[in-house]
Regions:
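N-terminal leader/linker segments that initiate helical-solenoid repeat arrays
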Residues: 11-108
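Canonical positions in the second alpha-helix
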Residues: 45-46, 121, 157, 210-211, ...
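Terminal, low-structured helical/coil segments at or just beyond the last alpha-helical repeat
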Residues: 194, 198-206, 211-219, 266-304
Length: 304
């Protein structure tokens, strides 16, 4: 019995603390990258000793997510893919341009393993906002032009935030307020708009409308929906409705002002353009933009 107790005590003494595991992990990652040789072995040992450790689960997520990725060059007919220009353009036998884009591809099994790790981390640490956004970021990269799961997760996150009012924790930030949360959501709106695919545009609109369902006077998301109608649907009447609503709330909103000028030009509505150009002159922070708006106003005045 004495030998068994001594052996157990020795084993406990030899098991590194969670902090020590994390220090070893960070050192390896700094030298070898997130999926370097030996990192999986260390993570497995860490998991065996501390199966619910948040840093360990984050490490496993990072390892499998990194491991799942590979770079490829694919041919696409469009001039841009996911908002990026081609890395190479050649011509086919008929002389038509063929664009080649560099993309990240994913191994489904390894990606699935990364998701299991981050989901367990979220389950054990429901108020860690960084973990939730890491999951969405991974899904966004994985799904590319069709971000259905990313959209679903973002909508659920918004609803959870607005109905449960969690006390979010985000490493590196002393306090997580509504402004930070909204700014993080807007980053995904920007990304989906940049992707410029039918599915990503709809995701952009749906996220914006979900935010507006809780904050109907939020000019950031009103501008978003206006841009959807302007750029995606070319429904200028609907777009103007949203931009005018923004300007009633915030008369110096540059996004709404500039897009109303663009809308006026697209519809050859000189009267409307002359209405909004002075606002650009008044509120723009850019000297060149103000000068350009003044010159345009003068040119329109000469034409009448």
């Amino acid at each position: 019995m004495a030998v068994s107790v001594l052996a157990a005590a020795t084993a406990v003494a030899q098991t590194p603390s969670s902090k020590e595991f994390n220090e070893r992990y960070q050192l390896l990652v700094s030298k070898l990258g997130p999926s370097g040789v030996g990192i999986e072995t260390l993570l497995d040992k860490w998991e065996a000793a501390y199966p619910d450790d948040a840093d360990m689960l984050l490490g496993k997520f990072t390892y499998y997510f990194s491991k799942s990725q590979s770079s490829a060059v694919v041919a696409k007919p469009q001039e841009k893919f996911l908002g990026e220009k081609p890395v190479l353009t050649l011509k086919d036998t008929l002389g038509n341009p063929v664009n080649y884009f560099q993309v990240t591809e994913y191994d489904d099994e390894l990606f699935g393993m990364s998701q299991k790790s981050i989901e367990k981390a979220i389950q054990l640490n429901p108020d860690r906002l960084d973990l939730r956004f890491l999951k969405v970021a991974a899904l966004t990269g994985y799904e590319k032009e069709s971000p259905d799961m990313a959209l679903s997760n973002l909508k659920s996150l918004i609803i959870y935030n607005e109905t449960q009012h969690p006390k979010w924790v985000y490493p590196g930030y002393e306090k997580v307020d509504e402004e930070l949360f909204s700014a993080a959501i807007q980053e995904y709106c920007f990304l989906f708009f940049k992707y410029a695919t039918p599915v990503s545009y709809e995701a952009f609109k749906e996220i914006s409308e979900t935010m507006l369902s809780y904050h109907p006077s939020d000019v950031l998301y009103l501008d978003n929906v206006g841009s959807y109608w302007l750029v995606v649907k070319h429904d200028y009447k609907q777009a103007a409705k949203y931009y005018n609503k923004v300007l009633k709330i915030k008369q110096d909103d540059i996004t709404a002002i500039k897009n109303m000028i663009l809308l006026a030009r697209n519809t050859s509505n000189t009267k409307l353009e002359k209405k909004y150009l002075p606002l650009l002159v008044k509120y723009s922070d850019s000297e060149s933009e103000r000068l350009s708006a003044k010159a345009r106003l003068e040119a329109l005045s000469i034409k009448k």
